[in-house]
Amino acid sequence: MNLIGLTAALTAFFSIWFGHVAVRKIEFISPTIWIPTTIFGAVGISVEFLSLAMVNRPSSVVFGILGITLLFDAFEFSRQQNRIREGHAPANPKNPRHDKILVQHASATTLDLLKRDPVGESVDPTRAAKLLTEH
């Protein structure tokens, strides 16, 4: 029985899920983004080299997917910061880096647009903000 496909699918699902959550949480609290970016990049490259050195194919697949996911997450830290500037992700007013973003970019917000109840229709930005602050 060949389990490489299942192994690859599960590894991709869980590593992407972990990366998404980790980037949001780490970027939210980190006073600089270069440190987590460097760590994720270095670990990603190391895991990729480990994947290349493995003889066991399923393990090589797992490490290859984990490595490339970590490398992409390193790139995502700067993209997440851009989402905060544009108001697409919440800023953390307790984070000095985010505090500067809130001052410099009128579109930045502390409202988490993912923490809302859907109303089943399109709403304008004013009503969206009202819906977010009501709950």
Predicted regions and their residues:
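Helix-coil boundary and interhelical linker segments in multi-pass alpha-helical membrane proteins
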Residues: 1-4, 53-57
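Hydrophobic alpha-helical transmembrane segments of multipass integral membrane proteins
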Residues: 9, 13, 42-46, 63-70
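C-terminal ends of transmembrane helices
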Residues: 18-28, 74
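Hydrophobic, membrane-inserted alpha-helices
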Residues: 19-20, 40-50
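Loop-to-helix transition at the N-terminal end of transmembrane alpha-helices
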Residues: 29-44
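Alpha-helical transmembrane-segment detector that highlights a single hydrophobic TM helix
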Residues: 54-93
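C-terminal membrane-adjacent module
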Residues: 96-135
